[in-house]
């Protein structure tokens, strides 16, 4: 992946930023994509390794796009694979489908990299292929969000020749943000079909000490009961959303979608979750309240790991789920294998258990039984 040119600058002028990052949802003549990036190592201090700006033309060949220029630069630096890197982009437009495909490949090949994309605007958000591309980015593990006022101010301070002037939001800035935020949330609110292998192995590995697993992933199956027999109906994958208003965990994402689009009082449901983490106290409480109100829903939760199982609030959350009829269990080998076969783009590769899977299962299962006694 070698673009024919690289167009990088340290900072941009104020008028350039205001023109190209103007967050009006529909704009013409903004044919240059600006990508401000930061690369940090993960850790307590998280030192910033580099921060610059790439430019690219939206109507040129994909290899000339700003996203591809960044990937060429990053891969060309041959940064050590044993270190974990946190990449943040502030972009004037969200990536096109071609760039998204390359980004998904990049993230699959670099499990030590996390990518957050904060966009000023959504590119062709009404077109099906572009909406699917945003969902694919999320499936690949990237975080996608709309730039808010704090992020605009941060870019102004760090990527603009501001000459000491503060960032001043323009007319209808808040209205534009609210519209784009709602639109992106609607695009990403529906469940994904599956996840990529590196996502599954990283987030569902049942380690005793699972450092860096700061996201919750939830695979679900849903059966409706007809003529006293369950009939398979729906399945999918949720992950926690980057939402400055709600910080929506995967469990809340499921409940929101289920209540708005699926739930009927005249239908009985058998729902099974396979989660990377057990629910936090707030989510456990909401799920317990939901089950108390809807006796037509039976829920079984298989979890790869117990979240803060030594904390009494988290223990009480698990007990509240059990008291409202939810079955809470630890994922074992057959459950991981089932998820691999049904919720992962596995290319017909078999599930490969990791060292310590059975031992960790026994440890977590004993802890769960102690909590639920």
UniProtKB/Swiss-Prot annotation:
Enzyme nomenclature, EC number: 3.5.4.38
Gene name in the database record: APOBEC3F
Native source organism of the sequence: Homo sapiens (Human)
Name listed for the protein in its UniProt record: DNA dC->dU-editing enzyme APOBEC-3F
Result when mutating residue 67 to A: Decrease in cytidine deaminase and antiviral activity
Binding of Zn(2+) 2, residues: 249, 280, 283
UniProt binding sites for Zn(2+) 1: 65, 96, 99
Role, per record: DNA deaminase (cytidine deaminase) which acts as an inhibitor of retrovirus replication and retrotransposon mobility via deaminase-dependent and -independent mechanisms. Exhibits antiviral activity against viruse such as HIV-1 or HIV-2. After the penetration of retroviral nucleocapsids into target cells of infection and the initiation of reverse transcription, it can induce the conversion of cytosine to uracil in the minus-sense single-strand viral DNA, leading to G-to-A hypermutations in the subsequent plus-strand viral DNA.
Self-association and partners: Homodimer. Interacts with APOBEC3G in an RNA-dependent manner. Interacts with AGO1, AGO2 and AGO3.
